[in-house]
């Protein structure tokens, strides 16, 4: 008897960001028997689980059983001992599930206090450990660079993490697509690698200073692949860092950033899985599939093809500005799945002055934008918020713009018995059919004068300038 392990080649590349959204996904591997007299096959697919970046529900498997790899990883294993595909025939193992993916943007300014690590915690012990040649904190280059960056940071965890992120982006290149994870010595010698290998450099530098860090391994709904890194802050949680995105966009900020377009298939690297009961194999990266086959003839080949496709089932709509008034407008949106609140910042476009910052609860679907000046252009930055542990994250940022309307005036002829307000010769004229109270307001919001008007016509001279006249529910803009 012979058995042969083959793993899928990994294509890790970047692509444009998609909106936070939900998918119905089918993940499968098809084995085609080219010329074997097969006696047995064992096939493994990673099983995605819910975590801070995604919610996974409704898992269904074509065959096999789901097993726990560790606290944060699972896999589907099917051991096929009869009914093997004959030469030229195929066998497919598949899983289907629904997933909602969450973009994550973290404002580092919220971390005003950093706590020492609990060195006895499971997170600390697992994610500061070496892993053979793949995470090797004794590597001379890793030791030298980590010591230098640690000194530059003054021993501050966040400063050190950012320096590591910038160091990798500045000193290494994206190379060798489809190679999977290499030993750290190879990555350093080559001067880079694909996104998983670039993440490896960051993870090695973090673990060298006993800061918990790990790879995040994904497959996108279109079947492409990506890997980024996370590091951990005690009492706060995990922070995403996408070094490869920084290489693609050198002016972008991908520190505390997750695009939200990849289905996380596993976390960390170097996993030990049982391909048969009681028999274990350590694979470097669990992203697509592993498989083994046994055959009677002297030689033989079984080819494998992986396919993951997601059908989008829901996408959050873009926020919409309602009808604008001279003094404001309204903003509305469909609820964002997973959001724990919403924030809008309103600023004056011409000056950049922040006018207002409004926070709304998770069940809100609209907010008023009041107290704005007439005939003025404003920008609105709308952000759905999501609390992840003790970290406030934003699930994307939406930039909108509006221009407020002009204050209605009444300088035209109006039939007798109707309210009329007009300016002539530097004077204010008000004709009202009944007693009214009028407010003369300057454009900066200051009440210049309050008038108690009898029925009939009223007039007074006005200082030069522009004013808003409020009478009942009517408002008028006049220039003197």
Where do the PLM segments sit?
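C-terminal outer-membrane/trafficking sorting elements
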Residues: 343-358, 373-383, 412-480
